[in-house]
Amino acid sequence: MKIKRIEVLINNGSVPGIPMILNEIQDAIKTVSWPEGNNSFVINPVRKGNGVKPIKNSCMRHLHQKGWALEHPVRIKAEMRPGPLDAVKMIGGKAFALEWETGNISSSHRAINKMVMGMLERVIIGGVLILPSRDMYNYLTDRVGNFRELEPYFSVWRQFNLKDAYLAIVEIEHDSVDAQVSLIPKGTDGRAIR
């Protein structure tokens, strides 16, 4: 799988270990392949034909091997009970969060806002959201969150004046298309079966 771009929204102060963390994330993304066992990510170009959840599996396995905790709960506010973060690396008692979007665009907003809330509360020191490109989006489950659709809101998150915080969006894309490869299985929740 290839990384099209990394859009840094917040990079204030000193967040320890950022180069190492970003290298681990980029290396993990590059392990993502389809079909499984392939050395690249080849997608069947059926419009809305491919599932999204299986795509992140090898990335998460790689991060886990590097000491990241998977499906990690982070307590942000007493009145909030956000779902767990896909992956967390603890640095100096604080979490660096990673979310790989498998839901709709509303889920993308929630993922970013959860990380920003955690930074405001000082329990999260940084976060990265991984989103498909618009080209890749065309071949995935209907209405999955994607980079282009979230991009108009980047200026909102850039306005947060957070001390010692880092926030970025990584845009990913398939390496190639091939109508002969199998479709990525879809889940049975939300819009996955559409």
Curated annotation (Swiss-Prot):
List, separated by semicolons, the cofactors it needs: Mg(2+)
Q: Pfam families, alphabetically?
A: BamHI
One GO biological process term is: DNA restriction-modification system
User: InterPro entries per the record?
Assistant: BamHI/BglII/BstY (IPR011338), Restrct_endonuc-II-like (IPR011335), Restrct_endonuc_II_BamHI (IPR004194)
Catalytic reaction(s) noted: Endonucleolytic cleavage of DNA to give specific double-stranded fragments with terminal 5'-phosphates
Residues binding Mg(2+) 1, per UniProt: 86, 100
- The protein, known as: Type II restriction enzyme OkrAI
Q: What's the name of its gene?
A: okrAIR
